[in-house]
């Protein structure tokens, strides 16, 4: 997903006092890079000893974004059952890029519900959003709210709670703040446990936040993933 995952308000931004107008594909906003987003491109690929590499070239002005940019995404799998996803980008001018992947996980198998998955996210704040999913700039403390996963909790416990943020998003679609600074340190972003199968998963990242999405806008959201 790119050039920029999630929404950019009013499909525009300013760099060095110059405003760039983007493709508005989500009402008045840009979502996932617009109609020209990386998810609509045919990538080049090559096999790696332990995975696969995808590469793409995006020219200056594509989707309204400035700068020629080359991106690489590596998927690697090792003998410790660790899947790593690494994004690389190179450009020669000031621009914005915020890549992600859209992998979803259901630890009890296809067609099963995720509501009994136990989730832990070591974050005490989320980004507050508008009904159009645009961050307001405020940070909301999760304590005593449905968004508190600081202790292991079934996803379904508060999934349908009467909270405006959940109602707008048809469930969880929120950015959890893991740290306040940018660093290369890998931290645990989330851990997931499915009690029937005993399967578990830990997510690590060097980025300052993780987004929890329970696929409320999918056809069968309760059988999707997180």
Stretches found by the model and what they are:
Residues 1-226:
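An exposed, glycine/acidic-rich loop-and-rim segment of catalytic or binding clefts
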């Amino acid at each position: 997903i790119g050039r920029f995952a999630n929404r950019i308000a009013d499909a525009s931004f300013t760099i060095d006092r110059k405003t760039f107008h983007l493709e508005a594909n989500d009402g008045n906003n840009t979502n996932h890079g617009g109609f020209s987003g990386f998810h609509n491109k045919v990538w080049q690929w090559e096999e790696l000893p332990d995975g696969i590499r995808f590469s793409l070239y995006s020219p200056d002005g594509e989707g309204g974004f400035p700068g020629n940019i080359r991106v690489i995404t590596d998927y690697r799998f090792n003998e410790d059952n660790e899947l790593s996803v690494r994004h690389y980008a190179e450009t020669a001018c000031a621009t914005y890029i915020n890549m992600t992947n859209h992998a979803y996980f259901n630890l009890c198998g296809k067609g099963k519900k995720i509501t009994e998955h136990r989730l832990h996210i070591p974050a005490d704040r989320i980004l507050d959003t508008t009904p159009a999913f645009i961050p307001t700039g405020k940070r909301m403390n999760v304590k005593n709210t449905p968004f508190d996963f600081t202790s292991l909790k079934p996803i379904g416990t508060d999934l349908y709670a009467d909270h405006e943020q959940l109602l707008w998003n048809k469930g969880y679609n929120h950015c959890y703040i893991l740290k306040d600074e940018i660093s290369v340190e890998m931290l645990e972003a989330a851990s997931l446990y499915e009690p029937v199968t005993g399967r578990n998963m830990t997510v690590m990242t060097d980025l300052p936040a993780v987004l929890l999405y329970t696929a409320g806008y999918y056809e069968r959201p309760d059988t999707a993933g997180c």
